[in-house]
């Protein structure tokens, strides 16, 4: 059987198509890389992508500490993994920032953990037990089904069992949990961990890597400072 010579024109057309496809891939890929790195190089973050304005949020206060809030629950494994990053940021947090943790009450079990948070805060035993509770639940599989189980766990760790239960049942703790729930709803929180700045901006935790979340927080803090400086006519600090 004899071989037929390939049509030179067909070969040329095929090579042209392949070259066009390769060039298109390079251009599109390069453009995508440029867009993804341009934000990192400039240090800019984009509203709608990295953060958003909370629906119905009040205006950013024109003075006073800039409030940064972490919404979390001891029952959330992602919050447990995020907590070291929160602590790292807190060690160098700006002096004009007021940071707070806001436990969410997505379920009765998480409401109990929110009550425990404020009871420990009221008895000055939060620092000693905050990480212990995270580890007990997520590293050791411990369940806290009622207040007595939490009281037994924290007993002797900065607080007595009776003092903890008294604080947990107090009107002050109930008010704190109610306010935390109100703040959660006003901030449109439906997943944790979540971060808000000045009760006006929310970090898009679904699109921002956890390790970059506080970069967006710092960006928004700087943005608020700059806007305040323009309003007051002074240079931002």
Regions found by a protein language model. Give the residues of each.
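Extracytoplasmic/secreted envelope proteins and their assembly/folding machinery
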Residues: 83-90, 113-117, 130, 147, ...
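C-terminal cap of thioredoxin/glutaredoxin-like
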Residues: 2-23, 156-237
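A short alpha-helix capping/helix-coil boundary motif
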Residues: 6-7, 66-67, 94-97, 128-131, ...
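Alpha-helix N-cap/helix-start motif
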Residues: 79, 109-110, 143, 177, ...
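Structural microenvironment flanking redox-active thiols in thiol-disulfide oxidoreductases
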Residues: 92-123, 127-155
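Solvent-exposed loop/turn segments at secondary-structure junctions
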Residues: 75-77, 105-109, 136-140, 172-174, ...
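Extracytoplasmic thiol/disulfide redox context detector
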Residues: 2-111, 181, 222-237
């Amino acid at each position: 059987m004899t071989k037929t010579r390939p049509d030179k024109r067909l070969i040329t057309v095929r090579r042209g198509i392949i070259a066009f496809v390769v060039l298109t891939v390079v251009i599109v890929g390069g453009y995508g890389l440029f867009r993804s790195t341009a934000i990192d190089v400039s240090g800019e973050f984009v509203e709608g992508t990295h953060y958003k304005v909370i629906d119905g949020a009040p205006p950013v206060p024109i003075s006073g500490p800039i409030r940064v809030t972490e919404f979390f629950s001891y029952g959330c494994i992602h919050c447990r993994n995020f907590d070291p990053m929160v602590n790292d940021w807190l060690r160098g947090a700006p002096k004009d920032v007021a940071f707070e943790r806001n436990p969410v009450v997505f379920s009765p079990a998480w409401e109990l953990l929110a009550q425990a948070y404020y009871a420990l805060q009221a008895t000055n035993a939060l620092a000693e037990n905050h990480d212990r509770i995270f580890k007990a639940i997520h590293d050791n599989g411990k369940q806290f089904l009622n207040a007595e189980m939490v009281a037994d766990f924290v007993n002797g760790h900065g607080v007595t069992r009776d003092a903890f239960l008294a604080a947990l049942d107090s009107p002050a703790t109930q008010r704190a949990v109610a306010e935390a729930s109100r703040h959660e709803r006003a901030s449109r929180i439906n997943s944790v961990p979540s971060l808000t700045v000045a009760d006006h901006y929310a970090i898009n935790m679904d699109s921002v890597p956890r390790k970059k979340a506080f970069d967006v927080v710092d960006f928004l803090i700087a943005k608020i400072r700059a806007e305040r400086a323009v309003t007051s006519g002074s240079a931002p600090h």
